[in-house]
Amino acid sequence: MTREVAGRPRRACPDCGYVHFTDPKVGVGVLVVEDGRVLLVRRAVEPERGKWSMPAGYLDHGEDPRATAAREALEETGLTVTIEGLLDVFYNPPGRGGASIFILYRARCLAGEPTAGDDADDARFFPLDALPDLAFPSTRAAIKLVRESTD
């Protein structure tokens, strides 16, 4: 059953009145920039298969978003990174698939060479002025932020 709570219809238990609030999916990404080059991964899965994006994935229950960012970088690129700070937070309206909230961190590479893994089939650094076909509005927005900060 549903009932109106806080101005919206919410699923609620008819017996005890417990209201179920649907949590958004949260994605976390990492942007690594070195010597005017940005780390990107080519997506091996849909959506946007074959296009390039930042290493990213879903936040696991109970996981710190900064840890998610570092974990995704390691899983998708083989690189160990340190998180330097929050770059931006993006909102993706419901119904478009993927994460509703996307948290993007800036990071620095500590060790390793880019080697694709997990749901990426390639990983490498690209000059900011010679980027491949990018996936997702958040990837394009992140690149724009980096370009603006280096101008």
What is the role of each PLM region?
Residues 10, 31, 40, 104-106, ...:
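Conserved hydrophobic/aromatic beta-strand scaffold that supports enzyme active sites
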Residues 1-30:
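Acidic, metal-coordinating catalytic segment for phosphate/diphosphate chemistry
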Residues 59-83, 89-147:
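Unchanged
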Residues 9, 26-28, 48-50, 79-85, ...:
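A generic structural signal for short beta-strands and their flanking turns/coil linkers
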